[in-house]
Amino acid sequence: MDKIIIRGGKRLSGAVPVSGAKNSALTLLPCALLTDEPVTLRNLPRLADIDGFQHLMNQFGVSTSIAGARPEDFGRVMTLQATRLTSTVAPYDLVRKMRASILVLGPMLARAGEATVSLPGGCAIGNRPIDLHLKALEALGAQIELAAGYVRAIAPDGGLPGGRYSFPVVSVGATENALMAAVLAKGKSTLHNAAREPEIVDLCNLLVAMGAQIEGIGTSDLTIHGVDRLHGATYMVMPDRIEAGSYACAAAITGGEVMLNGARIEDMEATVQALRDAGVHVEPRKGGIYVAADGPLKPVTISTAPYPGFATDMQAQLMAMLCLAHGSSVLTETIFENRYMHVPELNRMGARIETKGRTAVVHGVEKLTGAEVMATDLRASMSLVIAGLAAEGETQVHRLYHLDRGYERLEEKLSLLGAEIERVGGD
């Protein structure tokens, strides 16, 4: 099994391209199920999860073609066409590796009148139930059945009538599934307390480009007027705000300066504020975001929250950066339980982090030291890389399949910035 070896202590400097957003791409891909015309997505990141979702779409009879497949390219262009659906079942062997597979439920139901999806796996971060997905689809008129590890959704004869649903808690995935189901419903649908993440806006913008009628984009109250059919579209995937924030933390912990080409500061204001509070200089520049750290890092107190709050997907990376802050930082995780699995690994590198329930206290230390560490999930694995970049000596990060799910060609990008990092085959 591959591992990454980092020889730390190098100051990061230079420019790095920010890839298309993984969390957006995995929502845009299933939109191809909503039309028999071609949907072309540009700036699609090269990631294991994207490849897995492509295989899932092929399972339904969706044709896919890829341009920009040269080894030196960042990003790709994929065209998907669901001329005729040959299956409405997402089987266990494809779904188990990737939670995002549940996002085919809404669009498949809207297009075909039924959908059967294996209950998802693919994530070790606490309990991520899909009950809100199912309740939202029921509110739009679907009949839901659960049996033998599968969920089956069935629309009434004539299609989904549409309806009204108020999310008891904000759910990004459930908002996405409900949106994709509602755009082809026979009537009007309203979604209250909907998620407002930039990735939701990206989804809405693609659906509108395909002919959907959606009001309230970017707010927590969405109104969808169902249409008879959607057409194809060509769309550019938004830049990955989590990847951009991760590289910003890497620049900061090494006392470096980095230009994040393609990043949009308006998508990541909470992350930018946290970095500024920690003493990092962040400013928008033409074509991206400039990040520089030329002084000591300061401790911060922060809680994760739904957008526009601080993203849970940035918690581990910020924590790694704060290991070298001058003072004690307090991080509270309000979105997912069990999202501190990186803490023991960071402590192996000399960090001083204490956890109690959903709160972690990070006592800044003078230095980190290289060690062999093991990734436990996607963002935790990036936190170990960030720590390794600043650590004295050599750090080896194992279980790279987590990183490959969410960071396009990580070692190449960090090498562009001067990091001494390589991927090698494991024992």
From Swiss-Prot:
Its keywords, alphabetically, are: Cell cycle, Cell division, Cell shape, Cell wall biogenesis/degradation, Cytoplasm, Peptidoglycan synthesis, Pyruvate, Transferase
> Does the keyword field hold Lyase?
no
Q: Where does phosphoenolpyruvate bind?
A: 22-23
UniProt key word Cell division: yes
Q: In which pathway does it act?
A: Cell wall biogenesis; peptidoglycan biosynthesis
Q: Where in the cell is it found?
A: Cytoplasm
Tell me the first and last residues of the signal peptide: none
User: Which amino acid positions bind UDP-N-acetyl-alpha-D-glucosamine, per UniProt?
Assistant: 99, 128-132, 313, 335
Cited CDD domains: UdpNAET
Coiled-coil ranges from the UniProt annotation: none
Active site feature: 123
Can you say what this protein is called?
UDP-N-acetylglucosamine 1-carboxyvinyltransferase
